[in-house]
Amino acid sequence: MSSAAGPDPSEAPEERHFLRALELQPPLADMGRAELSSNATTSLVQRRKQAWGRQSWLEQIWNAGPVCQSTAEAAALERELLEDYRFGRQQLVELCGHASAVAVTKAFPLPALSRKQRTVLVVCGPEQNGAVGLVCARHLRVFEYEPTIFYPTRSLDLLHRDLTTQCEKMDIPFLSYLPTEVQLINEAYGLVVDAVLGPGVEPGEVGGPCTRALATLKLLSIPLVSLDIPSGWDAETGSDSEDGLRPDVLVSLAAPKRCAGRFSGRHHFVAGRFVPDDVRRKFALRLPGYTGTDCVAAL
């Protein structure tokens, strides 16, 4: 087994982790989609294409009112929370990461999963979305999923370093490189969480390793969950959606961004029930109704 993106697999503990996953775990069973057998991989790809050919709910109500946020509005809302409400940055990242993990459990409930389906590859970038991904991975471990993190371009930011330490202390594996053999990833993991790019972050800003990782993620046939926006998309228009990732699940953080109007995957959640009512009114947000004490709502 070889990889153009890394060292000799015979010397790589990460590759042995993939092999152990293949030896110990049964084939991926139905996750509300076609079974990912040799025949069903094609079936899932076809379903994904069919879903993306439909007009999304958000696109239908695009002109009905301010459901989606522009990048500037999202930044202004965050400033309002940080400066006026005295939220801490780490607090917001924690709230979003926890809610993202809850959204994953809603889309892929643990009792319905086989052991293999519980394995989750979380791919993190060096900006704030990557920090949310690190928190998401930690909470997935608490929820008894089996996350592994690929974090190719590590940020020197103290928050990122602290979150990385927390994951390491909880024995969450980190991959030093991502194999280029797509089928190896398909067979080793039940799903992938995309926390690579966030609103306003271009692929070129995060370095070659992240760009190469996105190219690999585009080829996967296992379910893909994107946090806030699908990596590679223009946050305003979704105009790069043809070249960016096409997730099966989108988890919008706090409120959907404008590009979410182009999302036509299987599940769309709004995660993070922390926006105060007067802030919601100030920014004219029409957020979904949450059930009980849930921090996640399905659209």
From Swiss-Prot:
Tissue: Expressed in theca cells in ovary and in Leydig cells in testis (at protein level). Also expressed in brain and mammary gland.
Protein's recorded name: YjeF N-terminal domain-containing protein 3
Domain YjeF N-terminal: 74-287
Quaternary context: Interacts with APOA1. Binds to HDL.
Key words, A-Z: Lipid transport, Transport
Any GO BP annotation: regulation of cholesterol efflux
Functional description taken from the UniProt entry: May accelerate cholesterol efflux from endothelial cells to high-density lipoprotein (HDL) and thereby regulates angiogenesis. May orchestrate hematopoietic stem and progenitor cell emergence from the hemogenic endothelium, a type of specialized endothelium manifesting hematopoietic potential. YJEFN3-mediated cholesterol efflux activates endothelial SREBF2, the master transcription factor for cholesterol biosynthesis, which in turn transactivates NOTCH and promotes hematopoietic stem and progenitor cell emergence. May play a role in spermiogenesis and oogenesis.
NCBIfam families in the cross-refs: yjeF_nterm
Gene Ontology terms: cellular component: mitochondrion
Organism: Homo sapiens (Human)
One Pfam family this sequence matches: YjeF_N
Record lineage: Eukaryota, Metazoa, Chordata, Craniata, Vertebrata
Record has Thylakoid as a keyword: no
Ranges annotated as spanning the membrane: none
GO molecular function: NAD(P)HX epimerase activity
